[in-house]
């Protein structure tokens, strides 16, 4: 089976690429992309959020078969230490990270929101960010999304699903 992950065609060994295998485990165990986290396994927490064709999906319940022929983007492609995505920069400015476990999923959900809505209201943010943060940084997350939205509006670049980047960007591999 072949997947398009972070702009690169990735061949998965047929013996390991069960079509029912959750995308999360293919990313982490077969491709070594460990920025996407396992939290609950039932699509409730959002730690495993990635983009599939530009939409935020919970990879823990998304079978490989469902992403065949589609574009998968993980946190590793959101930005780089040299050139962080405006969301990553805003996350730091607003001091969002505490334990950090949910951050990659939160960032990916926020990136999907801003790609579709450049100026989200608090209600839009609350509706789009259904991820769970056990540290309770929701007000900071909302502030960071508003900060990033403003930064993106000031730049000439519109938010899209991220392009491939350095794997150790904020919220990336650990």
Which sequence ranges carry the predicted segments?
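Signature of N-terminal electron-transfer/Fe-S-associated modules in redox systems
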Residues: 1-174
């Amino acid at each position: 089976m072949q997947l398009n992950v972070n702009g690169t065609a990735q061949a998965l060994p047929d013996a390991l690429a069960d079509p029912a295998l959750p995308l999360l485990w293919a990313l982490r165990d077969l491709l070594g992309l460990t920025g996407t986290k396992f939290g609950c396994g039932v699509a409730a927490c959002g730690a495993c959020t990635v983009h599939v064709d530009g939409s935020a999906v919970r990879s823990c319940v998304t079978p490989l078969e469902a992403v065949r022929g589609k574009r998968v983007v993980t946190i590793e492609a959101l930005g780089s230490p040299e050139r962080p995505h405006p969301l990553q920069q805003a996350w730091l400015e607003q001091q969002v990270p505490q334990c950090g476990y949910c951050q990659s999923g939160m960032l990916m959900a926020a990136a999907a929101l801003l790609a579709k809505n450049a100026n989200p209201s608090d209600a839009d943010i609350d509706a789009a960010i259904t991820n769970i943060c056990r540290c309770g940084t929701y007000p900071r997350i909302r502030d960071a999304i508003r900060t990033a939205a403003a930064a993106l509006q000031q730049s000439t670049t519109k938010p899209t699903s991220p392009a491939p980047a350095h794997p150790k960007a904020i919220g990336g591999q650990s």
